[in-house]
UniProtKB/Swiss-Prot annotation:
Its EC number is 2.1.1.199. This is Ribosomal RNA small subunit methyltransferase H. It comes from Mycoplasma pneumoniae (strain ATCC 29342 / M129 / Subtype 1) (Mycoplasmoides pneumoniae). Specifically methylates the N4 position of cytidine in position 1402 (C1402) of 16S rRNA. SUPFAM superfamilies: Putative methyltransferase TM0872, insert domain, S-adenosyl-L-methionine-dependent methyltransferases. It holds the Pfam family Methyltransf_5. InterPro entries: RsmH (IPR002903), SAM-dep_MeTrfase_MraW_recog (IPR023397), SAM-dependent_MTases_sf (IPR029063). S-adenosyl-L-methionine binds at residues 35-37, 54, 80, 101, 108. The lineage of its organism: Bacteria, Bacillati, Mycoplasmatota, Mycoplasmoidales, Mycoplasmoidaceae.
Length: 308
């Protein structure tokens, strides 16, 4: 059994405040993780319900135990892109608030065997969904050509000079059986050594980010789930999403703009209004105090919109 609350919830107070929770409302946490946000949502419910979704088996196992005495909680184990497919089995199909937290949990980062971190030696895995049918990060490095890997690093890590990194990683894979996360990290650092300003930890993090995003199809999944949000929300229901890097942010900003802005065609006699409105004109950022206690939240941004 996992230890209690192995992950600190990001922007917790801001999320709970902006969900505008009603005691009899129905709420959906599409990235329930280890139940941090969801626990606080539940505290404000009387006759309302909470539905939690996560693709991480450890998270669902933890939350099943955490919420075992809660009759108003339902958990779904799947990629949130597939959540819409589960509606037929659920009693609640429309929600008063939906939350997506796109961050990788501290538990995933700190557990070496999950392979997300370059701080600890472990298998180069990085799977959010630990199914045998899902390839690992190591599988991806083996399958992709040097040219394809270069493209992945540039597109999903926004990495300058990705070619020598890709070349070095392919050489590592060809010459080393089952290299660890630390060996992958050392290879990246060595390949980047000719580019003085790219020796930083941030550069290494971007390489790991690129492979993780590609492996787990994160941006593709985000695009799919965003298409379903308007259909899942009740009128006056709110959608909250926390992003952590520029690729997510760009996708979310474009999505929100389309839902909250409408160009009135001059030939239409009836004035049309967009289906959603912005609750916060600018994204909500972590406080200095939160960043001090949990440095991993420093890049987090919370967007909030409401269905009219």
């Amino acid at each position: 059994m996992l230890s209690n609350q192995p992950h600190k919830s990001v922007l917790l107070d801001e999320v709970i405040h902006n969900l505008n929770i009603k005691g009899d409302g129905n709420y959906l946490d599409l990235t329930v993780g280890f139940g941090g946000h969801s626990q606080h949502i539940l505290e404000q419910l009387t006759t309302g319900t909470l539905t939690g979704n996560d693709m991480d088996k450890d998270s669902i196992t933890f939350c099943t135990e955490l919420f075992k005495d809660k009759k108003n909680v339902v958990l779904v184990h799947d990629n949130f892109a597939n959540f819409f497919n589960h509606l037929k089995q659920l009693k609640v199909t429309k929600f008063d608030g939906i939350l997506i937290d796109l961050g990788v949990s501290s538990y995933q980062l700190d557990k070496p065997e999950r392979g997300f971190s370059f701080k600890h030696a472990g298998p180069f895995d990085m799977r959010m969904h630990q199914s045998d049918r899902v390839p690992t990060a190591l599988d991806i490095l083996e399958r992709l050509s040097e040219e394809e890997l270069t493209h992945v690093l540039k597109k999903f890590g926004e990495i300058a000079h990705p070619k020598p990194i890709a070349k070095a990683l392919k050489t590592l894979i060809n010459n080393t059986k089952n290299p660890t996360t630390v060996e992958v990290a050392e290879t990246v650092k060595a390949a980047a050594s000719n580019f003085e300003k790219y020796k930083s930890r941030n550069y290494l993090a971007k390489v790991f980010q690129a492979i993780r995003i590609y492996l787990n199809r994160e941006l593709e999944s985000l695009e799919i789930v965003l298409q379903h949000i308007p259909k899942l929300l009740n009128n006056k229901g709110r959608f909250l999403v926390i992003v952590f890097h520029s690729l997510e942010e760009k996708l979310v900003r474009n999505y929100i703009f389309k839902l909250t802005h409408f160009v009135q065609p001059p030939e239409l006699p009836v004035k049309l209004t967009p289906p959603f409105e912005l609750i916060t004109k600018k994204p909500i950022l972590p406080t200095e105090q939160e960043i001090k206690t949990n440095p991993r939240v420093r890049s987090a941004k919370l967007f909030v919109i409401e269905k009219k």
